[in-house]
């Protein structure tokens, strides 16, 4: 029986010892593991960082940017103090727009609008007795004048362009016919022949009342169309050719004139000399030719 009690006491002691050991293991082992992990993690991370990181190159731009980041706030803190209100308002061309706005803010006025509007608002509220010193050549006035000048120049250029285009169109619409001397002579003969076959009534017409057909004798010379040269003007019978219905007419009496059948010379006089006259001999020859043509027709 004593042996049985001894065995039971040993068994209880061993169970208690086992319980104590298990309790010790359960309480101490996790604490040691956590401490070891905490000690190992920084060492591992530090070694990995050292292995993975590469040496950075020197970048002066990065340093300048960093310096600007540090210096920019310091500059932003330095604010220029507003100028106090002057006793006399300076002219608009001697003060900037920001200064005018600061003065308006000091007086509680609106700062909206152009520079000239802000200036006039400040003058009206703070300096009503002072005479307005508004120079003509302010910035706004210069801009307005420049715009007006630009518009005037544009309008003038447009008118000049349209005028040149009209002149060019007129030049294109004008047809200039240049005929040689033989060609002109043949054309004149053709016209004369066409008139010759017409009746006398068509080769004769009345002279207008206000026309000076017969010329008086004078000293000097006159240009004869048929001869193509200057002849003496002191002879009687010089006539001035008349142009009617697209052809030339020779006065025969003070009331009648007949067609020109003589061929004009292809020679032109000097400038300033009248070239629409017929000498007495040519006037007589033209009259005789008219009679012959009418006789042949009969």
UniProtKB/Swiss-Prot annotation:
Chain positions covered by the region annotation Disordered: 36-61
Main location: nucleus
InterPro entries (UniProt xref): Dppa2/4, Dppa2/4_C_dom, Dppa2/4_central_dom, SAP_dom
Tissue: Expressed in embryonic stem cells. No expression is seen in 5 months embryo, mesenchymal stem cells, embryonic fibrocytes and adult tissues.
Protein location: Nucleus
GO MF annotation: an example: chromatin binding
Gene Ontology cellular component annotations, sorted alphabetically: nucleoplasm; nucleus
Pfam families with a match to the protein in the record: DCR, Dppa2_A
Boundaries of every SAP domain copy: 92-126
Subunit architecture: Interacts with DPPA4.
UniProt-recorded name of the protein: Developmental pluripotency-associated protein 2
Gene name tied to this protein: DPPA2
């Amino acid at each position: 029986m004593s042996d049985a009690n001894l065995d039971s006491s040993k068994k209880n002691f061993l169970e208690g010892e086992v319980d104590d050991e298990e309790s010790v293991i359960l309480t101490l082992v996790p604490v040691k593991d956590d401490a070891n992990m905490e000690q190992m993690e920084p060492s591992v991370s530090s070694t990995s960082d050292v292995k993975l990181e590469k040496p950075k190159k020197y970048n002066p731009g990065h340093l300048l940017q960093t310096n600007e980041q540090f210096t920019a706030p310091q500059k932003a803190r330095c604010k220029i103090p507003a100028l106090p209100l002057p006793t006399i308002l300076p002219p608009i061309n001697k003060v900037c727009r920001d200064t005018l706005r600061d003065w308006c803010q000091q007086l509680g006025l609106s700062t909206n609008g152009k520079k000239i509007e802000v200036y006039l608002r400040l003058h009206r509220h703070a300096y009503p007795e002072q005479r307005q010193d508004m120079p003509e050549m302010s910035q706004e006035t210069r801009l307005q004048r420049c715009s007006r000048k630009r518009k005037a120049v544009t309008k003038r250029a447009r008118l000049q362009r349209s005028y040149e285009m009209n002149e060019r169109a007129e030049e294109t619409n004008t047809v200039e016919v240049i005929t040689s001397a033989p060609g002109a002579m043949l054309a004149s003969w053709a016209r004369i022949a066409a008139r010759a076959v017409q009746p006398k009534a068509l080769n004769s017409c009345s002279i207008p009342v206000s026309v000076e057909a017969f010329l008086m004798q004078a000293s000097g010379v006159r240009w004869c169309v048929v001869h193509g040269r200057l002849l003496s003007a002191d002879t009687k019978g010089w006539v001035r050719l008349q142009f009617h219905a697209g052809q030339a007419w020779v006065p025969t009496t003070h009331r009648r004139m007949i067609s020109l059948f003589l061929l004009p010379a292809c020679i032109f006089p000097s400038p300033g000399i009248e070239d629409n006259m017929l000498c007495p001999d040519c006037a007589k020859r033209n009259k005789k030719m008219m009679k012959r043509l009418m006789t042949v027709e009969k």
